[in-house]
Amino acid sequence: MLDDIRGPGDLQGLSKRELDLLADEIREFLIHKVAATGGHLGPNLGVVELSLALHRVFESPYDPIIFDTGHQAYVHKILTGRAGDFDTLRQKDGLSGYPSRAESEHDWVESSHASTALSYADGLAKAFELTGQRRRHVVAVVGDGAMTGGMCWEALNNIAAAEHRRIIIVVNDNGRSYAPTIGGLASHLAGLRLTPSYEKVLDESKKLLRGMPVVGPLAYALMHSLKVGVKDAVSPQVMFTDLGLKYVGPVDGHDEHAVEDALRRARGYGGPVIVHVITRKGMGYAPAEDDEAEQMHSTGIIDPKTGRAIKASAPGWTSVFSDALIDVASEHRNIVAITAAMPGPTGLSKFGERFPDRLFDVGIAEQHAVTSAAGLAMGGLHPVVAIYSTFLNRAFDQVMMDVALHRLPVTFVLDRAGITGSDGASHNGMWDLSILNVVPGMRVAAPRDASRLREELTEALAVDDGPTALRFPKGEVGEDIPAIERRDGVDILARPASGLHADVLLVAVGSFASTALATADRLGKQGIGVTVVDPRWVLPVPPHVVELAGQHRLVVTLEDSGVHGGAGSAVTAAMQDADVDIPSRDIGVPQQFLEHASRGQVLEELGLTDQHIARKITGWVAAMSREIGDSTVNPAAQQVD
């Protein structure tokens, strides 16, 4: 049946039996396609019936459907004509793992960071109202913990104040965080509450009873209490109705007919409505259902029959951090950890198992996480905030004003720093150095290998007079890279080959150390002498890096980060402050949003490989030599293979 679905319109004539068969087929399709490419499997297996119902009830794209978070949108993509592209999911020039405005008119926003859909919906509904398009509905599908984010409640406060705006909020509750009651009574009461005649009778009764002397207010209070009491007995979602929003549910999210019925009732109400749908993450796929921790939230390439990874992965940066933190925390009871709903992905699950009273999962609430960490530090503890680099952006003010201003010992561990690749523009961690570079008193380390990660984490946790941060990339950790020597905290990784001048100081930031060494080897073969250093602590710039800069003809910083305001900018500024008048260049990530592809493909496209970097440095050195008439550089160095 799936071959016949080229758009939402093809769903309209299907019977209940056909819809059930289509749901089964979609699940099989997802399992086999995502197994081959990797992606967010569990969340999408849980929204099959919900997605079918949404596209049968609403007229997308006329009625925008906004997914929060966007990794729930695979079925939406299938139903809007993109099933044929799933072999390219998260691949270069292929289908994005999130909604993409470039892919389809059905994708209104690039929704990948959580808790934003309700604000988008609020703005769209206001725009439709002001432009005379009041009959259009806006649907926000909020799930996978997004309701724990403060933005959702800020938006709800505004949405509830406009009773006439057609905003349908679908709460996809797959975490069982509420105590749902699913059944006929709940469905009946939901229908009753959304019936216009019920609202009219209730309003008229309020006016009549309030106008009656003595007994009127009492009768009204009794009537109101009875309604509230029955409602509370059926569903605990008083928080929504207390805000002034109509509420329907809970609804069995795997009964397409029930979900569709609830959505049609909500659509007919004409104002903002909450539709509470109970779903099961990983539904219909035993390996996901049996994964109690994450329900196969996100997978690499797997065997579709067993759900097991095809390739055994080597130790990753996250696992090294996880073990290192436990080791240090075992000796220092003041160390605690905070996660924003991601204990597994950030490596804190094992910490929580070992020290359950020292791990705090605050939900998708990065701002709260950082200020809560500040409070923990004020209380004499040393909190570790483990967070994806890209999500640190959401809490910049808290880092600046609540932690740094108070010179508090909080350590930020920034996972997925630099180019992440297949998750696309929203998940590349290319902004953290630029952000942290402006924070007074912030010290940032970028370990080049596993040993340095353990070493620098220990050093960070010993700092008691201000904030620190460690950044490392996604993926496997390579072999340790030994230093020739360490001077004033700076590791010397390579010196110019015998007989070559100290032409270039190559400052390698973090995991780019291996690329820097390969670049130096290429340049050495062309007669260009290169010193490679790892500052270890890249912000503020160590004085010895500036001292070494004065001993070379050119300084080049190589970083897996944005070039504006990053480590290279800091090196240049430090040289200027010290009156070191040596040319400096920065090689890093251009300040632009990058399309999804593998990390290697993105680096190749950006020219961040040793071959491209060597060619660029060769050109700079040759140009400098021509300007001063220096013949000490091998002319062949103008071409680097």
From Swiss-Prot:
Thiamine diphosphate binds at H71, S112, H113, A114, G145, A146, N174, Y285, E366. Its cofactor is Mg(2+); thiamine diphosphate. Binds 1 Mg(2+) ion per subunit. Mg(2+) binds at D144, N174. GO terms for cellular component: cytosol. Keywords: Isoprene biosynthesis, Magnesium, Metal-binding, Thiamine biosynthesis, Thiamine pyrophosphate, Transferase. Catalyzes the acyloin condensation reaction between C atoms 2 and 3 of pyruvate and glyceraldehyde 3-phosphate to yield 1-deoxy-D-xylulose-5-phosphate (DXP). Belongs to the transketolase family. DXPS subfamily. Homodimer. This is 1-deoxy-D-xylulose-5-phosphate synthase.
